[in-house]
Design a protein with these regions (language model features):
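Conserved ABC ATPase signature
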Residues: 41-45, 49
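Conserved catalytic motifs of ABC-family nucleotide-binding domains
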Residues: 62
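Catalytic Walker B motif of ABC-type/P-loop ATPase nucleotide-binding domains
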Residues: 66-69
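A short, surface-exposed alpha-helical micro-motif characterized by mixed small hydrophobic
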Residues: 108-110
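ABC ATPase "signature
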Residues: 126-127
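C-terminal boundary and immediately downstream tail of ABC-type ATPase nucleotide-binding domains
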Residues: 134-171
Length: 171
């Protein structure tokens, strides 16, 4: 099926009249930036667009809470930033509480107000995001933050090396 009935499906489950389902689905595609692709098939969309369809479908029944399980895991950094911006707007403008499940510390730090660190099925640390990242108490979070800092440093070094090499080639 195309995107429009996919977004409307939760409304069908709630026995919403067909005309209202289509109207609501078309409306929801606008805020997620897909108003012009309602008649396309999911296979014709990029990964980021497919994620936006899933977000629109999740909003169909006006939830107060939305669970986002690895919402950016298969996306490039530009698309990840766009999806996080969209989720931030949903939280702020629609007053929807977001529960974000992610393995990415940068995603957690970027969008979450509070973080719960889970290790082996147990919460090992929980609190305000900035405080947790500034002063981690658990060994696992300390290690992950240190590893992320090393990785960030590597990316920075790679970018600097590439820039230096490009300048050498231009000379």
């Amino acid at each position: 099926c195309t995107i429009l009935p996919s977004v409307a499906f939760p409304l069908e489950l709630n026995h919403t009249p067909k005309a209202r389902r289509e109207e609501r689905a078309r409306y929801l595609l606008g805020p997620v930036g897909l108003g012009d692709v309602a008649d396309r098939y999911p296979s014709q969309l990029s990964g980021g667009q497919q994620q936006r369809v899933a977000i629109a479908r999740a909003l169909a029944n006006n939830p107060s809470i939305m669970l986002c399980d690895e919402a950016t895991s298969a996306l490039d950094s530009t698309t990840t930033a766009q999806i996080l911006d969209l989720l931030r707007r949903i939280n702020r403008e629609l007053n929807v509480t977001l529960v974000i499940i992610t393995h990415s510390l940068s995603v957690a730090r970027n969008i979450c107000d509070r973080v719960a660190m889970i290790d082996g099925g147990r919460i090992v640390e929980m609190g305000d995001t900035e405080q947790l990242f500034a002063n981690p108490q658990s060994d696992i979070l300390k290690t992950l933050i240190a590893d992320a800092a090393i990785e960030d440093h590597r990316h920075h070094d790679d970018a600097t090396e590439t820039t230096a090499t490009e300048k050498e080639q231009q000379a």
